Amino acid sequence: MPQLVFLWTDRLIFLLLGAVIAFAVYALRHEHLRAPWRQVRRRRLAMAALVVLLVYVGAGLLDSVHMRLRLTNEGGQNVQYAAEIVSALDLIGKPLVSRSEVSFSAPFATHAFVKQVARQPDGRTIMEYSRLRYGGAHLQDPEQRAGDIIGRALKGGVVGALIWALLVAAVGLLARRGDQRLVYVAKRIIYGQGETPWRTILLTAGAVFVLVGLVTNLATHYHVLGTDQVGQDVLWRSVKSIRTGLIVGTLTTLVMLPFAVVLGIMAGYFRGWVDDVIQYTYTTLSAIPSVLLISAAILSLHVYIATHEEAFPTVVERADLRLLFLCLILGVTSWTGLCRLLRGETLKLREQDYIQAATALGVRHAQIMMRHILPNVMHLVLITVVLEFSLLVLFEAVLSYVGVGVDPSTDSWGNMINSARLEMAREPIVWWSLTAAFVFMFGLVLAANLFADAVRDAFDPRLRK
């Protein structure tokens, strides 16, 4: 059995997952929370976006299960583990990890993108576009590439479609009520009847399964999105970057919420000098340039790691600490907007009759804020959280581009864009690294924004149907 390794970001991400599950169970037991989510469930576009988000979340969670593999021990004693820390996603994608080339190669290429030194049988050395070691290496004749790609794509798509068909059958069986015939259930799904848009959900899931099956079957024989300067598969780097984007978007929110909720409600409820102090605090914090503050924090972290190397023996642990520190700094600097919103809403709620009655009856201030004010501002919290998520994912890419983001050894879309900056200036242009980062980031941000729009419409009292 491998030895599990719990990085700080792993612990926090699973803590956040547990909090989400607990909130879901709590919401199912309370009608006033269940009703808005029921409205979200009726939105076809939101459910399609949720399917895409679940794919990203699944990849991120698999990449958050870290371990050290057990080394082979013939004697059966003194069990030892490898020094390298790998994730469950690394084990699943092991064929892609081990298939590194020498340097650049274009998508689906069989030859290198740049000329390399090759030694001839007579001892001479020449510069040529040599065959790749893994990409299309199974082809005896490179001219067979087009037909081979089409055949493997069709085979992978069929496998994905078969898995999707099993999923559809399972959904149909679970959707049956009483003695309903399966044909009747299938008819309701096909015509989009019922509160839950199962047709949209299943069609989106079908597209995902077919795409994953197609790409997986091709990726075992070709570099679908090419390779980078050091020969790493760009598709694999893009998939590994999902975890970084999700962590920056979620853990930053986890850090931001306590500051924003507590201080915002306190400022609006107590008013007076408490309101003045909190306003001066977030006004001063907003005046500090975020990039400069993050740069100073990252440099301070480098000094701390350099003086405490024994606490962080591996590159993965040092990179994880830098990622966690980046989330902390972003959380500390990004709570001011939500704090202002909650302060304004609390000022309005404080004048309501039920708040005045609770104060007159001698209810404690903490109890009033927890039981009467917080539930009435939760729609603002949820709306802000889902909208800020996509902005934080984009902000991480910007920070990595300017050199103050995550560690260079960490796979992230920002690091891919930063490395592609010089590649776009060369001739011929190496465009696939930038394109891959853009496509994966665009898919996550678009799905998050579409789902956020539905959540906003459902929880905003002014827009609630």
Please place each PLM-identified region on the residue numbering:
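Alpha-helical transmembrane segments of integral membrane proteins
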Residues: 45, 170-173, 201-211, 227-465
